[in-house]
Each structure stands twice: as C-alpha cells, then as structure tokens.
Amino acid sequence: MLFQAGHCQSRDEHLWPKQQFTHIREALAHLPDDVILDGELYVHGWSLQKINSFCSVHPNCTPKPNAHELIYNIFDCFFPLHPLRSFAERTHWIQSTLAHLPAPISVVPTHRVTAPLEAEELYTHYRQLSYEGTMYRDSESPYGTQLSCGNKENRWTCLLKRKDWQDAEFEIVDYELTTGKHNEQGFKLTCKTESGRTFSVGSGLSHVEMRDYVLAPPIGRLARVRYLALSDQGVPTQLTLEAIL
C-alpha cells in the first residue's frame, strides 16, 4: 500500500475510500505531504486471503469488524522532489521519523549485510519466525519508479525477493487452450485437491506441449505444482506447473 497526505492507494492504482484504514490515516496524519510511504497491510499469522478480505476498494464499503487490527508495515518511501535519494538515506528517514510510532504503524527491520553468510542467517531467522522470506536491496539505489522498471514484469533491478516454495501433486480434471488479450496462446489446467476443491494453473508448459495435450488431454493424470502457500480453503496460491506426470 502507498500512503501520501492521508490517501491510501493499492499497487494496482485503486484508491481506498476514506472510511477504510482510518486508524492508519490518523496515525500518519502528522507526516509532510511530500513523502510517499511504501509498505503492506499485514497481521502476523493471518493468511493473505484473510487480509485481503478487509481491503475492499468499493466506494461505499463498510469496514469489517477487527479492521483496526491491520498493521501498516513500512519498508520504503519516495520523495518526488528528491527522486534520487538512496535506499540508505530513505531507510534513515524512516527509522528516525516512524520507528517510534506504536501500532498500527510498524517499520520493517532492515539489516546491512556484507557477506552471503550474514544474509543466509537473517533469512533463516525470519523463516523461523514464520515470515515468507526476505528482500535484498542495493543500499545506494534510488527508489524504483515505473520508468526505472522497464521489463514486462515491472521488476526493479536493485531489489530481489527471496521466498521458499513448496510443491505437491494434484489430479487433473480439465484442460483447455486459451487466448490472451493480445491473442497470445495459453492454457488452463484445472486440478483438484484431496478435499475436492478445484483450482487452475496457467503457466509452465511450452507451446509444443500445449498443442500435444489438446490431442491427448491429460485428464486423470497428476500435475506437480509449485506454490507459495495454501489459501484458507487449502488451495495453492501463486502457483506454476512443474510437470504433468
């Protein structure tokens, strides 16, 4: 979530209505208008699905009970009038300005590392605390604006996310070819969990494999799927097809 001058905006550029996250807006009301905070809404132990259920952008939505439990975890900031400030400078500003604030504001811990072993130890430490992973940044780099992130995934070359992935096998119950909005060919493979819930995966096959499976659909076979976590219903999220067995 981006925050500036009392406004909260999602990464897909939707503004949250003013009745959402009032506890966060009030906690940050003293900040100058020329800084944009970058972070995420989080409650340790809650699933992403549960957190998202509190984050409606509908103009007339009613905040859910317990919405005040959402914590704004801040990990970066941007100064439009000073766009070249380094990550080290921005981190210093965050620490000196925000670190003393109580909930619902939380400054994400940032550590300077000088050797791979230090990074490995910190990654292990935070995984043991049940966090998904860590983010590595170049301390001298400016904030990665959209103009700086020129590749199709909109990735900033000075930031690297590290997470653990899991894999499991699921029965395939349907397969079909798809066409994207730019007429590119794709596929949708529908799988079933042991509890009977279905989900779809649409990445991980070459174009040759896509066409081959039209002639000989893999229904009834097993798909090995790589995923980050399970939803509250036990369905894999952020998934990629590794293989059809």
What are these regions (language model features)?
Residues 1-14, 61, 77-80, 99-245:
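Nucleic-acid 5′ end/cap handling module spanning
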Residues 1-103:
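Covalent nucleotidyltransferase
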